[in-house]
């Protein structure tokens, strides 16, 4: 499941408990990420799911749900 994989990657990258991560969680407001964290997260997700997220798309991503929906729309899963 995409959400589970995304959640694990976010927890690992940000050093937080995966149980804190919800679909509606904001990277900055809820999970305490900064802009560098988000760039590193996008890179890790691109590698894990073998996708490429253009910068203009990455700038629109603000929540976990945004990332999950983008990945689902751009993968075969």
Swiss-Prot record:
Cross-referenced Pfam families: PP-binding
Record pathway: Lipid metabolism; fatty acid biosynthesis
Ranges where the Carrier domain occurs: 1-75
Maturation and modification: 4'-phosphopantetheine is transferred from CoA to a specific serine of apo-ACP by AcpS. This modification is essential for activity because fatty acids are bound in thioester linkage to the sulfhydryl of the prosthetic group.
InterPro entries: ACP, ACP-like_sf, PP-bd_ACP, Ppantetheine_attach_site
Residues with the O-(pantetheine 4'-phosphoryl)serine modification: 35
Keywords linked to the UniProt accession: Cytoplasm, Fatty acid biosynthesis, Fatty acid metabolism, Lipid biosynthesis, Lipid metabolism, Phosphopantetheine, Phosphoprotein
Record has S-adenosyl-L-methionine as a keyword: no
A biological process from GO: lipid A biosynthetic process
Gene3D superfamilies tied to this protein: ACP-like
One of the record's GO cellular component terms: membrane
NCBIfam families listed in its UniProt record: acyl_carrier, PRK00982.1-2, PRK00982.1-3, PRK00982.1-4, PRK00982.1-5
HAMAP family, per the entry: Acyl_carrier (MF_01217)
Family recorded in the similarity comment: Belongs to the acyl carrier protein (ACP) family.
The protein's name: Acyl carrier protein
Species whose genome carries this gene: Clostridium acetobutylicum (strain ATCC 824 / DSM 792 / JCM 1419 / IAM 19013 / LMG 5710 / NBRC 13948 / NRRL B-527 / VKM B-1787 / 2291 / W)
């Amino acid at each position: 499941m995409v959400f589970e994989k995304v959640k694990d990657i976010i927890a690992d990258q940000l050093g937080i408990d995966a149980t804190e991560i919800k679909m509606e969680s904001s990277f900055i407001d809820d999970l305490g990420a900064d802009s560098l964290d988000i760039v590193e997260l996008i890179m890790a997700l691109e590698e894990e799911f073998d996708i490429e997220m253009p910068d203009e798309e990455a700038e629109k991503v603000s929540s976990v749900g945004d990332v999950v929906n983008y990945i689902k729309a751009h993968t075969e899963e």
